[in-house]
């Protein structure tokens, strides 16, 4: 499975500051090629007439996030990049949405450990956010300008590890 190989190839290559250090080794090139394939597929889903081939993409930077209980990642964008990606390498959290019935995107809906993307303005009957509970091996690609955040979770002893990065077009 491609996500599994990306996880295996990238998980143990961090520096002390959680920046991933790509080296000129086949495993790293293979992992990067798989990430680029996902980004290319994403661009094709946006615009079937003007999408980006793998050869049109370049890696700007990549890092690892290690998140423990009560640690949020606040609202931010990656405006310096055309595209951003996240690969969820490890997630020991329990999905807070299990058994929950959503009612008109209520403020009471569970958000523990979820990533939230915000788009557009808030208007009556016009949702402007998307919540996603990431599972291990999820690969998520989105525009760099899209505002997002990661909610903290309260589950003690749980952790989540993700590899994230920015990609630009050549």
PLM feature spans:
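Hydrophobic, well-structured mid-protein blocks that either form specific transmembrane helices
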Residues: 49-50, 54-62, 85
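Catalytic core of non-heme Fe(II) oxygenases with the double-stranded beta-helix
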Residues: 61-141, 151, 158-159
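Double-stranded beta-helix
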Residues: 166-170
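Active-site-flanking beta-strand signature of metal-NTP-handling nucleotidyl enzymes
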Residues: 84, 164-165
């Amino acid at each position: 499975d491609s996500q599994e190989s990306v996880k295996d190839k990238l998980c143990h290559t961090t520096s002390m500051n959680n920046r991933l250090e790509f080296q000129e080794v086949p495993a790293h090139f293979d992992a990067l090629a798989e990430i680029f394939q996902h980004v290319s597929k994403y661009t094709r889903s946006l615009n079937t007439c003007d999408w980006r081939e793998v050869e049109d993409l370049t890696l700007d930077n990549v890092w690892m996030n290690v998140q423990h209980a009560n640690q949020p990642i606040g609202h931010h964008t990656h405006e310096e990049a055309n595209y951003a990606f996240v690969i969820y390498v490890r997630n020991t959290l329990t999905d807070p949405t299990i058994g929950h019935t959503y009612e008109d995107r209520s403020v009471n809906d569970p958000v523990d450990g979820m990533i939230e993307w915000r788009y557009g303005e808030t208007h009556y009957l016009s949702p402007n956010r998307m919540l996603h509970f990431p599972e291990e091996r999820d690969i998520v690609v989105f525009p760099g300008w899209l505002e997002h955040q990661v909610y903290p979770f309260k589950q003690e002893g749980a952790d989540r590890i993700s590899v994230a990065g920015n990609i630009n077009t050549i």
